[in-house]
């Protein structure tokens, strides 16, 4: 199965109070985004689509991505859904699509492979976690209605 991996890296990270975008902040000896790229590059039959904003040249100069990486410019930062929408023309038909944040370096290859293996056909798999204090985090509101 082909896997299209969308990595969202267009945010400016204003709250970081740094000259570097949030995805370029270091963790260990490399930028947050590089950790995500390195993990995703281990997925077979995958193609990376990295959505970047106004600092695209800076981001591309900081990280090492596979040659086949599709760098997608989000001209106006209009949210997560809009960022994903920018990649739609480049996604392969019938591929499994995985969306990740470029500032989320702790996702493990084992977790991604398990998520991908559970996604088939028209099904949707969503990887979330329960936070003890969700303040300041994006929320997933899930309502399951019985048929």
Language model regions located:
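Short glycine-enriched, charge-decorated loop/helix-capping segments at active-site entrances
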Residues: 20-26
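N-terminal nucleotide-binding beta1-loop-alpha1 segment
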Residues: 1-18
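Short, proline-centered helix/strand-breaking motifs
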Residues: 18, 104-105, 118
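Conserved N-terminal catalytic core of the sugar/cofactor nucleotidyltransferase
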Residues: 30-102, 106-114
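Conserved donor-nucleotide/metal-binding helix-loop-beta segment in metal-dependent transferases, i.e.
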Residues: 110-135
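Short beta-strand segments
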Residues: 8-9, 51, 99-101, 126-130
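Residue-level detector of conserved catalytic or cofactor/ligand-binding positions
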Residues: 139-147
